[in-house]
């Protein structure tokens, strides 16, 4: 089949390839305001599948869904100093209604910690009121300078969880349970071989005591943060006065967390799995898992097509391309949309009671007896997903290096983008210096540490920490 000319090859211009894939797969279009996108039905369907999977996992952790307002009074936001400093350059502000100035500026939420904290303050009186474990599926706005569909947009969709607890350990444990949930989801549903770990002091969330992350490596060797979980200790409960009466009858500040993933995950899927022919989607988040295409609409072809759909529909998202387009166009469209399996049904194959099944990832075709379609589809979907994960893991492993000095680190960066594991002191000033020299930053402190004392790769101080650094989106 001819290569789709609309898509720039990855190796020619990765950035343009990404944009071409988003547009041609009809995932999104550009909005009228810079940095905004229109989620087209196919792109939004992927987000709905992400929501469905994660929401079920959250409910297993007794998370309750809520919805909080879009607007935050400036005075409320400014109570947590680190938080306001972290977000102030990106905040969009409402100052008037019609021609009437507002008595106080209102911020369009960049995140909802302060709104949740204000609610918790009024809601929590006793340890018996705790824990409160909330989540909302919503939009937020952060006025980004450099934007790209899904990866970095001024308005994006996400889930943000916010919790408050009577015990420090309970809050800290939940932070890690959520990280485990994100890790399992990324690896099993999105087929992203992520590295879970802790953020450095420089990279942790504004106002957090500690931030945990899952980091993934894209096809071009740049890292992408795919989800974060933050433990605040009492950093928010003190300025927002979230107090409760403990079991001893004394007033105590509560312990809080927040955590989130966003539509940036769609960008991660594209940049990890897709190819020069368009989108390649993991089966769990593919709006259509199996597409049936008729070569010629004879009575027998129509009947067999409907029979196959009936046999598959209880287990898979399956459709029939009934558009009035040419057979070649239908094949190209199924490819560019990343549909995992395509079944072609035509009169010639049916003479031998066969149909043709094609895999999107390898583009291999096999002829299958009509009676075996269900079993073969089961097998091929498993093989398809396993291959996507294996390819992504191979890319990460081939692009992961170790360095012991800043010179060695720079040499690696010059030759090969990817993760570089280095001994690092963890100090903010040292990381600032690394960023100034290399335009890279730390991605995470992996949980798997050897605890050997070595010299920091940049400042030469003794350290036991090993940290991943990389260029990142």
Curated annotation (Swiss-Prot):
Entry-linked CDD domains: ProRS_core_arch_euk (cd00778)
EC numbers:
6.1.1.15
Note the PROSITE patterns from the entry.
Answer: AA_TRNA_LIGASE_II
**Cellular component aspect of the GO annotation:** aminoacyl-tRNA synthetase multienzyme complex; cytoplasm
Q: Identify the Pfam families for this entry.
A: HGTP_anticodon (PF03129), ProRS-C_1 (PF09180), tRNA-synt_2b (PF00587)
Give an example GO molecular function: proline-tRNA ligase activity
Q: Does the keyword Ligase apply?
A: yes
Q: Where in the cell is it found?
A: Cytoplasm
GO BP terms in the entry: prolyl-tRNA aminoacylation
**Record's keyword terms, sorted:** Aminoacyl-tRNA synthetase, ATP-binding, Cytoplasm, Ligase, Nucleotide-binding, Protein biosynthesis
UniProt protein name: Proline--tRNA ligase
What species is this protein from?
Mesoplasma florum (strain ATCC 33453 / NBRC 100688 / NCTC 11704 / L1)
| Lineage, opening ranks | Bacteria, Bacillati, Mycoplasmatota, Mollicutes, Entomoplasmatales
């Amino acid at each position: 089949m001819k290569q789709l000319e609309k898509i720039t090859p990855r190796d020619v211009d990765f950035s343009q390839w990404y944009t071409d894939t988003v547009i041609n797969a009809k995932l999104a279009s550009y909005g009228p305001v810079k940095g905004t996108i229109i989620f087209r039905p196919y792109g939004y369907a992927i987000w709905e599948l992400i929501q469905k999977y994660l929401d079920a996992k959250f409910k297993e952790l007794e998370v309750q869904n809520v919805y909080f307002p879009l607007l935050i009074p400036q005075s409320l936001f400014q109570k947590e100093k680190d938080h306001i400093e972290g977000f102030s350059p990106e905040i969009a502000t409402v100052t008037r209604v019609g021609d009437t100035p507002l008595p106080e500026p209102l911020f369009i939420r960049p995140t909802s910690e302060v709104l949740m904290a204000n609610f918790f303050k009024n809601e929590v009186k006793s340890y018996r009121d705790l824990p409160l474990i909330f989540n909302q599926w919503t939009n937020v706005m952060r006025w980004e300078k450099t934007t790209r569909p899904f990866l970095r947009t001024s308005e994006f969709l996400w889930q943000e969880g916010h919790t408050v607890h009577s015990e420090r350990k309970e809050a800290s444990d939940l932070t890690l349970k959520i990280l485990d949930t994100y890790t399992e989801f990324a690896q099993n549903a999105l087929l992203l071989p992520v590295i879970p770990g802790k953020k450095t002091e420089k990279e942790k969330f504004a106002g957090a005591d500690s931030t945990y992350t899952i980091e993934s490596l894209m096809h071009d060797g740049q890292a992408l943060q795919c989800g974060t979980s933050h433990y605040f200790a009492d950093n928010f409960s003190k300025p927002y006065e979230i107090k409760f009466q403990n079991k001893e009858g004394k007033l105590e500040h509560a312990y809080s967390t927040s955590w989130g993933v966003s539509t940036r995950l769609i960008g991660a899927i594209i940049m990890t799995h897709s190819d020069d022919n368009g989108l390649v989607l993991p089966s769990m988040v593919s709006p259509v898992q199996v597409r049936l295409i008729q070569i010629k609409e004879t009575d027998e072809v129509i009947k067999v097509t409907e029979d196959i759909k009936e046999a598959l529909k209880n287990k898979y998202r399956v459709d029939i391309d009934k558009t009035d387009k040419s057979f070649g166009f239908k094949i190209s469209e199924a490819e560019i949309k990343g549909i995992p399996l395509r079944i072609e049904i035509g009169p010639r194959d049916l003479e031998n009671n066969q149909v043709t099944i094609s895999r999107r990832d390898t583009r291999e075709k096999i002829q299958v007896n009509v009676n075996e379609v269900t079993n073969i589809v089961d097998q091929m979907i498993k093989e398809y997903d396993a291959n996507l994960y294996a390819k992504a893991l191979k890319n990460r492993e081939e692009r992961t290096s170790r360095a012991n000095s800043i010179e060695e680190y720079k040499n690696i960066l010059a030759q090969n983008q990817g993760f570089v594991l280095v001994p690092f002191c963890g100090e903010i000033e040292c990381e600032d210096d690394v960023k100034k020299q290399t335009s890279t930053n730390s991605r995470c402190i992996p949980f798997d540490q050897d605890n050997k004392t070595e010299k920091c790769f940049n400042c030469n101080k003794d350290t036991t920490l090993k940290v991943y650094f990389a260029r990142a989106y």
